[in-house]
Amino acid sequence: MTITETMLVPNFEDEAETGRKIAIICSKGNLDMAYPGLILANAALGEGVETHLFFTFWGFDMITKSRMHDLKFTPVGNTATHMPMGITPFPGVTGMATHQLKKSIADLGVPEVPEFLEQIVGAGGHLWACRLSADMNHLTDADLYEGVEGIISASDFIEKTAGAQLLFI
């Protein structure tokens, strides 16, 4: 786009489809890194934006039935927690930090990860699982959250989301 071109500004009062699309790649399975992608997806859907989430590598934990209810938050090596790094590896610290984060999130009325995924799918969001990650972890569709539309390759995801804004989390 050049300076002389008119910027595309969506008309949110128009009921017609905006043509906007966002693709969010969720690559982390920690509790604290699950929420940014889910919150952005929810916000995009609220604005009428076609929304696709692609779960890969550790982000697969967010959609794996056996793990999605038990995501953890570990402060080890995370200086943003403002905790003394010397105590973070001690037994119980991850459990305490996970409990505190879950409480803080719940106090704000934000749903837990499985309910958030359900909300996103209910609003028309699309969930995709990475074929390579599924194969590496010996997982099939039966192991995944029911709202996942399929296990696809990275190339297939790129094709499905052609022209989308892309976020890697």
What role is predicted for each listed range?
Residues 23-34, 63, 104-108:
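Short, glycine-rich nucleotide/cofactor-binding loops
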Residues 96-159:
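A charged, amphipathic interaction segment
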Residues 71-105, 109-112:
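A glycine-rich helix N-cap at a beta->alpha junction
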Residues 63-73:
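Glycine-rich loop at the start of a catalytic domain that most often binds anionic cofactors/ligands
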